[in-house]
Amino acid sequence: LGRFFFWLCRTRPEVVKKRLLDELPELLPEGYDIEKHLTPRYNPWDQRVCLAPDGDFFNAICEGKADIATDHIAEIKENGVELKSGEFIEADIIVSATGLDLNFLGNIEVTVDNEAVEPANLLNYKGMMYSGIPNLLASFGYTNASWTLRCDLTSKYLCRLINYMDRKDISRVMPTPDMSQVEFEPLLDFSSGYVVRKSAELPKQGSIKPWVMYQNYIADIFLTRFSALQDGALKFTK
């Protein structure tokens, strides 16, 4: 169901957005400003979609236990937050929900043959390896599903790869794209600020398999479990 909803958001975003907004008046107090507080500038799944189990978030608003302030922050003060509109919100605790800083491999400095590797020049292979870096697999989960799903596929693919290399007495494997056939695209098709801010510094995905970074668990099952290891993109050496 989650996969179908994601597909629908990508293929019919205006239809899904309208349906979601049409359901809100029944969940909120009469006259609540839905356009101001609950109508984002982007379409569903251009950024993450938040779910409210059993409508608990909307119940809290109806009961006066929660409220939404849609504005820009002018200043954080000792006892609350001042907004650009001049409104002041008193607060005992402020929880930061933004400001994530994406870093490739946790800012590990990677070198190959004493040459520093620039992450922005790398091409992702099957969501787990990178062009120009030998013998490296890294888990990178899904933006639209459980993060561990692709981690599980990556670990199983790694076992396949190691067993194959052991049988063939191979010590080195490296994704090597034909650059005349592949166009670079952003690694994540996501408009969240923390992604956009770092997009230019992160590795890229390609326009064709196996360089595409799928956000589709079913597609990745076939790509990792049933595809040939000798696919022309991996370069094996002894």
Per-range role (PLM):
Residues 1-78, 159-188:
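Dinucleotide-binding/catalytic capping subdomain of oxidoreductase cores
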Residues 67-69, 95, 137-139:
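Hydrophobic/aromatic beta-strand patches that form the interior of the parallel beta-sheet core
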Residues 84-93:
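Core beta-strand elements of the Rossmann-like FAD/NAD(P) dinucleotide-binding domain
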Residues 85, 98-99, 140:
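Glycine-rich, N-terminal phosphate-binding loop of Rossmann-like dinucleotide-binding domains
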Residues 96-113:
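Flavin (primarily FAD) binding-site architecture
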Residues 119-125:
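Alpha-helical scaffolding within the catalytic cores
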Residues 124, 135-238:
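C-terminal, flexible cofactor-proximal segment of oxidoreductases
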Residues 126-132:
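Short glycine/proline-enriched loop/turn "hinge" motifs that connect secondary-structure elements
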